[in-house]
Amino acid sequence: MAKKSGSGLQSSAGLMRYYEADKNAVQVQPKVVLIVGAIVGIAVLFLSAVNGFWP
């Protein structure tokens, strides 16, 4: 039987592309997401109260 050579490189090629894309992605800390979400929520509540949509 013939041995398969080079099969390890093909299986790891997808992982290498994933990690390269991950390095190029925008890095956002979880604190920033929570703070922006809280600010947007407060702004929505404030604007709805000002416009008379308060429950």
Curated annotation (Swiss-Prot):
Gene Ontology BP term (one): protein transport
Q: Which InterPro entries match?
A: Preprot_translocase_SecG, SecG/Sec61-beta/Sbh
For this protein, the parts annotated as crossing the membrane are 30-51
Please give the chief subcellular localization of this protein: membrane
Q: What's a single GO CC term here?
A: plasma membrane
Regarding the membrane, this protein is recorded as: Single-pass membrane protein
What's a Pfam family in this record?
Answer: Sec61_beta
Which residues does the entry place in the Extracellular compartment?
Answer: 52-55
Highest taxon of source: Archaea
**Keywords per UniProt:** Cell membrane, Membrane, Protein transport, Translocation, Transmembrane, Transmembrane helix, Transport
Cytoplasmic topological domain residue ranges: 1-29
**Localized where?**
Cell membrane
* Subunit-level organization: Component of the protein translocase complex. Heterotrimer consisting of alpha (SecY), beta (SecG) and gamma (SecE) subunits. Can form oligomers of the heterotrimer.
Q: What is this protein for, i.e. what is its function?
A: Involved in protein export. The function of the beta subunit is unknown, but it may be involved in stabilization of the trimeric complex.
The record's similarity note reads:
Belongs to the SEC61-beta family.
UniProt cross-references to HAMAP family, sorted A to Z: SecG (MF_00751)
**Protein name as it appears in the record:** Preprotein translocase subunit SecG
